[in-house]
């Protein structure tokens, strides 16, 4: 007898062993048709999985997040099947699920074209309609290796060769196509109905640039056409908001081949940068931070002591002078410890919060560079807090308050939080880890925040909290971090005199709110579609005259606004007013002031918003009050 317990607490009793599909059939025909897989004692399995002992079972349908992931995984196999049918001789490699879709890497004699993608997607639809049964089989390792070698799939054979000898290998077949996979998968290809191939890119085998270049085909799959259409519309909107396009359109910045991964900031873009930096500088000072500046080039010996030379050297720019090796700093922490070490520290000095807008360089692969989002030269809003173990909770709590306020002021209302706990390989005592993890969790709970644990994902030197923003398109951007460090202070000789007159090593909290200034500005541009809030806009007001008669009056208003601290300019060209309004609205300038004979006579201005809002006529003084209130509130 086999007892299967369902999520509602009811039991289904069977005389013998039973498959997951048979359990679904025993409940209702509708559920049996809808079921895609099962979660047996917490593990995802196929509908064909045999239940031999008393078990807990959750049936997975396309209404579950796991169901959508299984559909996408199966769609990756559908893609590989279609490619193999259309392009014999192609070798398949790996095809995982990613956020909002999947990809599959292929080795083929020529590059795939956009026309090929259309043909592949059409063949995928045909295979879906064949309603092929998807079957799992388990072979021993040697049989699986020989099978894939015999059919010319040498990449698959390599993957299996890396699997331990005694571990069985699972394969999935649909029609005459067989692939290596752990599963689970949908029961029939007809369950994969809504999908679209998106693009082709290059990818190295096993992610190693020393290996051969493969072709990666990206796709997306959904439960319904409505969901897919919404996603595609979102992508379309994201394309319009691409910070690289808007950066050019709004004359904010550019990059060029002579300085890959490094940004040329134009006057308007640098105004945005300065506004953010000034705001952060004032905010940090108001929260007990002191600002420092540390060298960008440091001797190899310091990087060896910190551990970066051993673990991070391939990402560092190295130079040599007078028979000494140096590295341009990829991060600021070793330099901050040197400032802490300069002079005798007492427990009375703690917590000490050292902040720096630190310029860093990392030797990122050229293929990974992407506008402002992935660069080689960047500035971090970095800070390190040196404190005692007993001060961790208080410092974490204060940092969370600070971070939340900053994000709100930049227009982000939703933050996702993850706590990464101790990994298997780590430094520090169990007691230290217990205290640190408890302090981080307690701080999050005291703030009544929703958060999730990432077990074992902490760094070897301490647990961390990650803060991820959601933008106006629902995309996620991991920006803020708070990282405890039990290792670096000791490695670099940091210490303080405790209350009992003994020397102790401080706890070091690495923390950032924006992350990289460059990346955060890119996120802001896309979040606001280039229409930055008034306080951040490089140009806040443009004054437009209708004819030459008002040119002098328009210039007078411009000067008056500038004297009031408003970033204003005038367009006195002899062009139609409708043309000038359209042009400056495209430049995302928040306020457009129109002056004609009537406004000049009444000593007023007619105010329009960049999105076409009509605020009517008002005095310059009234507008200044309105604008200054908006700037102060950071709206």
Curated annotation (Swiss-Prot):
Cofactor: Zn(2+)
Ranges where the record places region Catalytic: 242-533
Keywords tagged on the record: Aminoacyl-tRNA synthetase, ATP-binding, Cytoplasm, Ligase, Metal-binding, Nucleotide-binding, Protein biosynthesis, RNA-binding, tRNA-binding, Zinc
Pfam families: HGTP_anticodon (PF03129), TGS (PF02824), tRNA-synt_2b (PF00587), tRNA_SAD (PF07973)
Cofactor note: Binds 1 zinc ion per subunit.
Catalytic activity: tRNA(Thr) + L-threonine + ATP = L-threonyl-tRNA(Thr) + AMP + diphosphate + H(+)
A cellular-component GO term for this protein: cytoplasm
InterPro entries hit by this protein: aa-tRNA-synt_IIb (IPR002314), aa-tRNA-synth_II (IPR006195), aa-tRNA-synth_II/BPL/LPL (IPR045864), Anticodon-bd (IPR004154), Anticodon-bd_dom_sf (IPR036621), Beta-grasp_dom_sf (IPR012675), TGS (IPR004095), TGS-like (IPR012676)
Main location (coarse class): cytoplasm
One Gene Ontology biological process: threonyl-tRNA aminoacylation
Compartments (UniProt record): Cytoplasm
Protein name: Threonine--tRNA ligase
Ligand binding (Zn(2+)): 333, 384, 510
Function, in words: Catalyzes the attachment of threonine to tRNA(Thr) in a two-step reaction: L-threonine is first activated by ATP to form Thr-AMP and then transferred to the acceptor end of tRNA(Thr). Also edits incorrectly charged L-seryl-tRNA(Thr).
GO MF, one annotated term: metal ion binding
Subunit structure and binding partners: Homodimer.
Protein family: Belongs to the class-II aminoacyl-tRNA synthetase family.
Domain TGS residue range list: 1-61
Coiled-coil segments: none
Enzyme Commission identifier(s): 6.1.1.3
TM region positions: none
């Amino acid at each position: 007898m086999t007892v299967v317990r369902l999520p509602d607490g009811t039991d289904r009793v069977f005389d013998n062993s039973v498959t997951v599909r048979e359990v679904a059939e025993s409940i209702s025909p509708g559920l049996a048709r809808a079921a895609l897989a099962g979660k047996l004692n917490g593990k995802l399995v196929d509908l064909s999985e045999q239940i031999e002992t008393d078990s807990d079972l959750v049936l997975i349908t396309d209404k579950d997040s796991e169901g959508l992931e299984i559909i996408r995984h199966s769609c990756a196999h559908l893609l590989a099947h279609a490619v193999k049918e259309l392009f014999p001789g192609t070798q398949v490699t790996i095809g995982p699920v990613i956020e909002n879709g999947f990809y599959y890497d292929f080795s083929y004699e020529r590059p795939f074209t956009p026309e090929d993608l259309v043909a592949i997607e059409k063949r995928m639809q045909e295979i879906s309609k064949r309603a092929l049964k998807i079957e799992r089989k388990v072979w021993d390792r040697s049989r699986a290796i020989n099978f894939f070698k015999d059919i010319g799939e040498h990449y698959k054979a390599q993957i299996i060769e890396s699997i331990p000898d005694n571990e069985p290998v699972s394969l999935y077949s649909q029609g005459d196509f067989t692939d290596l996979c752990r599963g689970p998968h949908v029961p029939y290809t007809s369950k994969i109905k809504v999908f679209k191939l998106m693009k082709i890119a290059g990818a190295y085998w096993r992610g190693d640039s020393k290996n051969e270049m493969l072709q990666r085909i990206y796709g997306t799959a959904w439960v319904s056409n409505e969901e897919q259409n919404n996603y595609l519309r979102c992508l379309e909107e994201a394309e319009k908001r691409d910070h690289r396009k808007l950066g050019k359109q709004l004359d904010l910045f550019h990059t060029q081949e002579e300085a890959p991964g490094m940004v040329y900031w134009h006057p308007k873009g640098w105004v945005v940068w300065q506004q953010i930096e000034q705001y952060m500088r004032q905010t940090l000072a108001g929260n007990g931070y002191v600002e420092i500046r540390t060298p960008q080039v440091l001797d190899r010996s310091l990087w060896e002591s910190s551990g970066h030379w051993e673990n991070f050297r391939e990402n560092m720019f190295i130079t040599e002078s007078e028979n000494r090796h140096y590295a341009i700093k990829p991060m600021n922490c070793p330099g901050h410890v040197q400032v802490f070490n300069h002079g005798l520290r007492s427990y009375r000095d703690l917590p000490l919060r050292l902040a720096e807008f630190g310029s860093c360089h990392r030797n990122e692969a050229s293929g990974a560079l992407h506008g402002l989002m992935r660069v080689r030269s960047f500035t971090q809003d970095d800070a390190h807090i040196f404190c005692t173990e007993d001060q961790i909770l208080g410092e974490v709590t204060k940092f969370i308050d600070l971070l939340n306020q900053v994000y709100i002021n930049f227009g982000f209302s939703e933050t996702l939080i993850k706590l990464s706990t101790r990994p298997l390989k780590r430094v520090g005592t169990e007691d230290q880890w217990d205290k640190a993890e408890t302090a981080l969790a307690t701080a999050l709970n005291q703030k009544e925040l929703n958060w999730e644990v990432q077990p074992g994902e902490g760094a070897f030197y301490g647990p961390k909290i990650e803060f991820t923003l959601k933008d106006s398109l629902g995309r996620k951007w991991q920006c803020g971090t708070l990282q405890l460090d039990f290792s670096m202070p000791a490695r670099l000789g940091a210490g303080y005199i405790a209350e009992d007159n003994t020397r102790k090593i401080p706890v070091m909290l690495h923390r950032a709110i924006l992350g990289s200034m460059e990346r955060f500005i890119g996120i802001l541009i896309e979040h606001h579609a280039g229409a930055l809030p008034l306080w951040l806009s490089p140009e806040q007001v443009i004054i437009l005259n209708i004819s030459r008669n008002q040119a002098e009056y328009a210039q007078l208003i411009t000067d008056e606004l500038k004297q009031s601290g408003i970033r204003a300019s005038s367009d006195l060209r002899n062009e139609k007013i409708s043309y000038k309004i359209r042009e400056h609205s495209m430049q995302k300038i928040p306020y457009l002031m129109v002056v004609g004979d009537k406004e000049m006579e009444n000593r007023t201005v007619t105010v329009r918003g960049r999105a076409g809002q009509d605020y009517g006529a008002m005095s310059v003084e009234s507008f200044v009050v309105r604008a200054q209130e908006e700037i102060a509130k950071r709206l």
